[in-house]
C-alpha cells in the first residue's frame, strides 16, 4: 500500500461518493473504484458499503480513515521539518561562506 491509497480512501470518505472523489483526485471513477476494490481484497474487509443509491463507510472504514489521516498528517509534518532543516543548513552554509 502506498501513500496515494491513503489519500484516495480519505477523499472517498469525505465525499461519500467514488465519483465525486475521483473528480477531486483527477482520476476516473472506474480506476478509483478498482483501486478501492483491490485494497479491500488485500485487507480482507470492506471499508465501504455500496449499492445503487447509497455509499456508506463501515466501522472498519472509519478505523482505516482515522489512521490514514494520522499517517498523512505525520507525513506532511515530517516533510515540512525536513524542508525547514534543509533551508537552515543552506542558510548556515551560505552564511559561513560569506564570512570567509
Where does each model-flagged region fall?
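Conserved small/polar residues in nucleotide/adenosyl-binding loops
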Residues: 93-100
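A short LG(V/I)-centered, amphipathic sequence patch enriched
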Residues: 40-59, 79
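The N-cap/first-turn positions of alpha helices
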Residues: 2-5, 29, 61
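Short helix-boundary/capping micro-motifs
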Residues: 10-27
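Residue cluster at the C-terminal edge of the helix-turn-helix DNA-binding motif
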Residues: 15, 24, 38-46
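Immediate post-signal peptide segment of exported/extracytoplasmic ligand-binding proteins
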Residues: 86-92
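Alpha-helical linker/hinge and terminal dimerization helices associated
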Residues: 42-43, 64-86
Amino acid at each position: 500500500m502506498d501513500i496515494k491509497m491513503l489519500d484516495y480512501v480519505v477523499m472517498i470518505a469525505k465525499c461519500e461518493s467514488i465519483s465525486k472523489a475521483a473528480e477531486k483526485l483527477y482520476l476516473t471513477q472506474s480506476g478509483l473504484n478498482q483501486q478501492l476494490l483491490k485494497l479491500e481484497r488485500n485487507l480482507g474487509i470492506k471499508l465501504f458499503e455500496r449499492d445503487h443509491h447509497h455509499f456508506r463507510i463501515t466501522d472498519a472504514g472509519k478505523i482505516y480513515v482515522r489512521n490514514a489521516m494520522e499517517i498523512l498528517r505525520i507525513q506532511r509534518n515530517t516533510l515540512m521539518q525536513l524542508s525547514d532543516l534543509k533551508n537552515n543548513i543552506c542558510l548556515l552554509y551560505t552564511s559561513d561562506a560569506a564570512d570567509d
